[in-house]
């Protein structure tokens, strides 16, 4: 008798969209492209000693509520404007929880917080143009 020993915990399969498909569905806007380009140049100048400011990278570690994350980003942007001569503030957020072995795995893996694991929805949600164009 042959015993089933492989993939014993798999309960179903769902195809994950390739990255190029997500990128084609949600192209980056000119406004966001400019923000990323300019921010990277500023950070490079600071790290190479061409500026006296400090780069400050702040969380949250991961997000589960995109609207709350946008509100937080707006507050950081206001703070950065107030401290622009001293600091370059960068918001860093994970959409996954790479070190989590139990529990919720992050917005990409379970966007509805219901163990549905709709990765395609999660990828579209975190790359959605509506939040990215608000700052």
Features from the language model and the residues they span:
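Single conserved hydrophobic/aromatic residue that forms the stacking wall/gate
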Residues: 126-135
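Hydrophobic faces of well-ordered beta-strands that scaffold small-molecule active sites
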Residues: 56-58, 89-93
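Glycine-rich anion/phosphate-binding loops
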Residues: 64-80, 119-125
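Short, well-ordered coil/turn segments that N-cap beta-strands
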Residues: 52-54, 85-87
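A charged helix-plus-loop insertion that forms the helical arch/lid used to bind
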Residues: 102-121
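Polybasic, low-complexity association/targeting segments
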Residues: 1-14
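N- or domain-start disorder-to-order transition segments that initiate the globular core
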Residues: 14-47
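Active-site-proximal loop/turn and secondary-structure-junction residues that shape catalytic pockets
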Residues: 62, 93-99
């Amino acid at each position: 008798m042959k015993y089933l020993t492989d993939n014993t915990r798999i309960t179903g399969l769902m195809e994950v969209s390739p990255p190029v498909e997500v990128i084609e569905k949600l192209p980056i806007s000119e406004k966001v492209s400019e923000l990323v380009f300019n921010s990277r140049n500023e950070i490079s100048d600071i790290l190479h000693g061409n500026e006296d400011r400090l780069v400050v990278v702040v969380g949250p570690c991961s997000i589960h509520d995109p609207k709350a994350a946008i509100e937080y980003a707006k507050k950081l942007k206001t703070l950065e404007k107030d401290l622009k001569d001293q600091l370059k503030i960068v918001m860093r957020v994970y959409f996954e929880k790479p070190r989590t072995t139990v529990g919720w795995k992050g917005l990409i893996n379970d966007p509805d917080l219901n163990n549905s694991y709709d990765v395609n929805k999660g990828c579209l949600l975190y790359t959605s143009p509506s939040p990215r164009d608000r700052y």
